[in-house]
Design a protein with these regions (language model features):
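Conserved short alpha-helical elements in the N-terminal third of ANL/AMP-binding
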Residues: 1-15, 31, 36
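Gly/Ser/Thr-rich phosphate-binding loop
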Residues: 10-13, 35-40, 49-118, 130, ...
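ATP-dependent adenylate-forming carboxylate-activation enzymes
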Residues: 13-33, 51
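Alpha-helix capping/helix-boundary segments
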Residues: 44-45, 80, 156
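Conserved ANL (AMP-binding/adenylate-forming) active-site segment centered on the GW(Y/F)…HTG consensus within
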Residues: 93, 154-173
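Short Gly/Pro-enriched turn/cap motifs at secondary-structure boundaries
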Residues: 116, 120-126, 170-173
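Conserved beta-loop-beta connector loops within the AMP-binding
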Residues: 132-151, 170
Length: 173
């Protein structure tokens, strides 16, 4: 919500909210409009790839042109498989910007807007964001050991509204 809705509105951009995802509705909207930014989760990109690969002729040419003309395309909220990233680039000419965030923090990690975007990664911590991996016992993991992502920074929200117990269980210094 923060990245897809609040940020564009804050700078005076307009936002199209298409409702529940239907691949036909998204393709139709993209073809009828001149969007400059598009953000979606990996499952939507997967469905769009499937749809585009079944298109032919002028319809295919139009949708590819419309996606290619966009200034920025982002993927977030889940891991984007490298093969989806590659296929999207082949079909549209767009190099997806993978990012990581959540409702509680907005965006915390990102590949660079300009420069090398590493497929299959969410990039590095944004300015003023500290990130570490922790084990269940709240101990920072050793290098190359899996763990839960922990984020600290000024963008982390303060609390769950009227949910003191949930807040205490979820946040610590």
């Amino acid at each position: 919500i923060i990245n897809a809705l609040s940020c564009p509105l804050w700078i005076g951009a307009s936002v199209d909210i298409l409702g529940a995802f239907e691949v036909e509705r998204v393709v139709e909207a993209v073809c009828k409009n001149n969007y400059s930014v598009f953000t979606a989760v990996p499952t939507i990109y997967f469905s769009l790839i499937d749809k585009i690969e079944r298109m032919t002729g002028k319809e295919l040419e139009l949708v590819q042109t419309k996606f290619k003309e966009m200034r920025l395309m982002m993927s977030g909220s889940a891991a984007l498989a490298p093969e989806i990233h590659k296929k999207w680039s082949e079909l549209t000419g767009q190099d997806l910007l993978e990012r990581y965030g959540m409702t509680e923090v907005g965006m915390a990690l990102s590949n660079p807007l300009k420069g090398e975007k590493r497929s299959g990664t969410v990039g590095q911590a944004l300015p003023k964001v500290e990130v570490c991996l922790m084990e269940d016992n709240k101990v920072i993991t050793e290098e190359n050991v899996p763990g839960e992502i922990m984020i600290k920074g000024p963008q982390v929200f303060l609390e769950y509204w009227n949910q003191e117990k949930n807040t205490k269980e979820s946040f610590f210094e």
